[in-house]
């Protein structure tokens, strides 16, 4: 279970042995020689995720190199006015400034764009398929949460933490009703199966 949890956290967006180490795999009791087999097993067990990384990688490169729009499912990739746009199912767009092709440290072709780096300074940032997938997944997750916030606008929502909403209400408000409303599927992403869980507490804490 421990191996599975750290693998999900570290490997979902292209991470490998280095990502496992950064997440504390060695401190959790895993041995160095276990890490690469864990990466290989995770990727073997999740072929659709791995395939999506590289489908997105190709779509981004096509948009930047050929200026041609393309789609993967309900996500669109296009180049316009010196910007790379990734259009999400909600219609919201992620924007990457002045994208161009470059060569990464492994000698492979990669996409770079201008943005704020880790040192909080404007610089050219290198990216690739799995990283763009991370941006897409987190952005869609945000849009789903925002849809839930609007659905529950009749409640007093005084905060949210990642995928959680914190609602202050009287004790006679039904938790089941709130969970049902929060788990409704947005009209712009039909077919996605959502379920919300909740709990009641006198003060905010992790369940």
What are these regions (language model features)?
Residues 1-207:
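Conserved catalytic core of nucleotide polymerization and phosphodiester-bond processing enzymes
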């Amino acid at each position: 279970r421990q191996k599975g949890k750290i693998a999900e956290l570290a490997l979902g967006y292209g991470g490998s042995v280095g990502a496992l180490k950064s997440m504390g795999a060695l401190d959790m009791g895993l041995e160095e020689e276990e890490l690469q087999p864990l990466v290989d097993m995770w990727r073997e067990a999740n072929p659709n995720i791995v395939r999506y990384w590289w489908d997105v990688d190709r779509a981004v490169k096509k948009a930047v190199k050929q200026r041609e729009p393309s789609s993967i499912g309900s996500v669109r990739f296009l180049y316009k006015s010196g910007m790379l746009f990734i259009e999400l199912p909600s219609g919201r767009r992620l924007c990457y400034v002045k994208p161009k092709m470059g060569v990464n440290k492994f000698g492979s072709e990669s996409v770079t764009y201008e943005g704020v780096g880790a040192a909080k300074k404007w610089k050219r940032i290198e990216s690739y398929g799995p990283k763009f997938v991370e941006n897409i997944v987190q952005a869609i997750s945000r849009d789903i949460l925002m849809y839930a916030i609007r659905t529950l606008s009749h409640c007093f929502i005084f905060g949210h933490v990642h995928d959680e909403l914190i609602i202050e209400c009287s004790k006679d408000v039904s938790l089941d009703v709130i969970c049902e409303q929060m788990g409704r599927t947005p009209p712009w992403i039909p077919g996605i199966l959502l379920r919300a869980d909740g709990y009641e507490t006198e003060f905010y804490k992790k369940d």
